[in-house]
Amino acid sequence: MYKSLFTASLLALAIASPIAQAHQAGDIIVRAGAITVQPNDSSSGVKVDRGALAGTDLGGKATVGSDTQLGLNFAYMLTDNLGIELLAATPFTHDVHVKGAALGPANGKLGTLKHLPPTLSLVYYPLDKASAFQPYIGAGINYTWFMDGDTSSRAEAAGFSNLQASNSWGLAAQIGADYMLTDNIMINGQIRYIDIDTQVYVDHNTLEGGVRAKVDVKVDPWVYMVGLGYKF
C-alpha cells in the first residue's frame, strides 16, 4: 500500500508545472514528516545463550512490529546535483513477538524495544536545478541504537526479564522526490531500505538457576516518510 501511494504521488508531481527553482550548491534543507518503519524481518530459532542450558535450541522464531514516528531530515547540497543527508527521528517502539519456541507463556508478545536509526547518505539529484520536481536516489550507512526493552507482563509472570537487543551497523538505500511549492517550501516523499541485523536477548530468572535466551533477527525494514521541507 505504501509503495503504491508513493508511486502515485511521484507521478502526480512529475506532471505538475514547475513554479519555483529547486536545489543548488550551498543550500541547507530541513524536512519533517511522518515516518514509518515496516520490518521485512526474519529470524533464527531461539537458543539458550548463557547459563546451565547454554546451547539448547528452543526452536520458534521472532517477529518485530511496525511503528510510526516524527521523522527529521537534514541535507546540505555539495553541488547542484549532489548532497549529503542525515535521517533522524523520535524513538521508534516495536513489539517483539515469539512464536513456536519452548518458552511456555512467553510465546506471544515478549515485550517492546525502542531504537533510534540515524542514517547518513550521499544523495544524487539528476534533474536541472530549474525544475521544481526533484527526484533523487541515495545510498549510505545506518547505525541503529537499541535502548533497553520492556518485557511484557505475561512474560514477566513466567519469569522472564531484561529484554535487550544489540546495536547494528548496516547499509541503506533510498529513492525520493521533492516538489517545490515556493522558492523555499517543498513537499517530500521518500522510501528507504535499511540493513539492520540484531540479536535479541531475554533472561529467565528461575529456570536452572537463571539462563539467557537469544534470537538473531534480520529486521531489514522498509522506511516510508512523507512531509514538508524548507530550504535555507
Which residues fall in each region the model found?
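Cleavable N-terminal export/targeting peptides
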Residues: 1-26
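Short glycine/proline- and aromatic-enriched beta-strand/turn motifs that initiate or cap beta-hairpins
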Residues: 21-73, 229-231
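Gram-negative (and chloroplast) outer-membrane scaffold detector with strong preference
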Residues: 27, 38, 73-152, 219-232
